[in-house]
């Protein structure tokens, strides 16, 4: 914040859209945390090397899960939220995703819109 507010150039890790493919292998609209050159004009991602094969697949899978969860949260339904949860690599089956979602939704019912509860 200081680099931006004070127009004091710095290289910092920032969460930004992957515009221009700063991190190869991810869509331009995927939010990635990469090194950026930051000053009063904003944050400009520094081009990155592709992630190592050992972590690339799971990172792409988690990015897709996060995208699906965000879409469900903004204007989706319970079914969309369950599908998002099922896309998480630690959730083994759709039945487990439904059970997890129902438990989370029940615990957070007062914060959720009705469309995510039915």
Protein language model features and the residues they cover:
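Long, compositionally biased stretches enriched for glycine and/or charged residues
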Residues: 1-118
């Amino acid at each position: 914040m200081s680099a931006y507010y004070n127009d004091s150039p710095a290289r910092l890790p920032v969460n930004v859209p992957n515009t221009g493919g700063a991190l190869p292998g991810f869509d331009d609209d995927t939010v990635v945390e990469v090194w950026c050159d930051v000053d009063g004009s904003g944050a400009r991602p520094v081009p990155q090397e592709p992630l190592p094969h050992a972590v690339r697949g799971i990172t792409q899978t988690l990015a897709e899960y996060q995208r699906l969860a965000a879409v469900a949260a903004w204007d989706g339904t319970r079914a969309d939220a369950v599908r998002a949860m099922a896309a998480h690599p630690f959730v083994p089956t759709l039945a487990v995703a439904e059970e997890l979602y129902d438990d989370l939704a029940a615990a957070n019912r007062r914060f959720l819109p009705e469309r995510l509860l039915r």
